[in-house]
């Protein structure tokens, strides 16, 4: 049995399709790994790349190089933020202090780099391979440039990883072999993730609900949860219960807007919606939080957006409307 996908939990259909392609030596020019975040698409991509570059039985030394991004014939591209005139990869944004209020993009220059990379002669392997992580984040010009590359496939291999493949051009999707990924069952999630360090064995129910069968999403929700200052979550819940006066509401808006960046604030709204739905199921409150989320996305001054929303909710306007 091949060890290429030993760390992939579940995803039997994806595993079967990828192993068949490797065993038969019939590789498509492009693949689309489609499914929710955090269910193993990147793990599967690494295993597949190892098989493409080293054969069906894999190679441990090559595996380490791929994981470290240290192979001359592999290019891994991810969406970027534009921060002070520089492009910051999504995976480095938090460490770089990027505000992350706007969504990252795959940009035209990145796709041009993909085309050049696939068109060059490989240095070690039989072919060059490129992974486009977050492919649905392509800007329009970038998508059109990628389509031209797909229309003239060479000897290289391209893997697109997408959470929302329907956002890709249909002409791009039609030129890729689809590898579908689904959500994991609870027992499979437990195999992937240990309990949150220093917490009870069970995660807060809202985190599990938001993860919706994705261990990677659960891990991300845990990370955001740990970033929320102590007491803020309880204060948000108390506010809707009517136990917070206007001054306390303004103080809460100040505290969370100063402590959390744009992405973390967006996540906190998402958590708050889920927590309130579990407790009250009042559509008016959820609509108000949807409006707050849109305002935060639209570059409204965050503290002001929070102040207005919290004052309205503390005053009961949205509970009775």
Question: Model-predicted segments: where are they?
Answer:
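Clamp-loader machinery-focused feature within the broader ASCE/P-loop NTPase space
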Residues: 1-141
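Charged, glycine-rich active-site and insertion segments that engage polyanionic ligands
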Residues: 1-65, 155-157, 163-321
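Helical "lid/switch" subdomain of P-loop NTPase nucleotide-binding domains
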Residues: 110, 130, 134, 138, ...
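Conserved adenine-binding aromatic site and its adjacent loop/helix in ATP-hydrolyzing domains
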Residues: 116, 148, 174
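Conserved catalytic/switch belt of AAA+ P-loop NTPases
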Residues: 119, 144-159
């Amino acid at each position: 049995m091949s060890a290429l996908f030993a760390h992939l939990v579940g995803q039997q259909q994806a595993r079967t399709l990828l192993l068949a392609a490797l065993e038969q030596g019939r590789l498509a020019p492009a693949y689309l790994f489609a499914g929710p975040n955090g269910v193993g698409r990147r793990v599967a991509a690494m295993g597949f790349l190892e098989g493409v570059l080293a054969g069906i039985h894999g190679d441990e030394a090559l595996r380490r190089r791929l994981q470290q991004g240290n192979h001359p014939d592999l290019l891994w591209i991810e969406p970027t933020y534009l921060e002070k005139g520089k492009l910051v990869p999504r995976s480095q944004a938090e460490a770089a202090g990027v505000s992350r209020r706007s969504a990252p993009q795959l940009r035209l220059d990145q796709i041009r780099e993909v085309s050049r990379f696939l068109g060059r002669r490989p240095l070690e392997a039989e072919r060059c391979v490129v992974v486009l992580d977050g492919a649905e984040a392509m800007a329009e010009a970038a998508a059109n440039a990628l389509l031209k590359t797909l229309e003239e496939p060479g000897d290289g291999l391209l893997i697109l990883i997408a959470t929302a493949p329907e956002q890709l051009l249909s002409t791009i999707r039609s030129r890729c072999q689809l590898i579908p990924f689904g959500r994991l069952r609870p027992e499979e999630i437990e195999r992937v993730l240990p309990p949150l360090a220093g917490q009870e064995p069970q995660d807060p129910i809202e985190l599990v609900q938001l993860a919706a069968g994705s261990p990677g999403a659960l891990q991300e929700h845990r990370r955001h949860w740990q970033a929320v200052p102590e007491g803020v979550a309880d204060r948000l819940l108390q506010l809707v219960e009517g136990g917070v006066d206007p001054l306390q509401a303004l103080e809460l808006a100040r505290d969370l807007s100063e402590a959390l960046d744009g992405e973390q604030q967006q996540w906190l709204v998402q958590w708050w919606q889920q927590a309130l739905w579990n407790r009250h199921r009042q559509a008016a409150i959820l609509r108000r939080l949807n409006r707050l989320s849109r305002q935060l996305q639209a570059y409204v001054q965050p503290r002001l957006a929070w102040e207005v929303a919290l004052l309205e909710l503390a005053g009961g306007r949205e509970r009775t409307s």
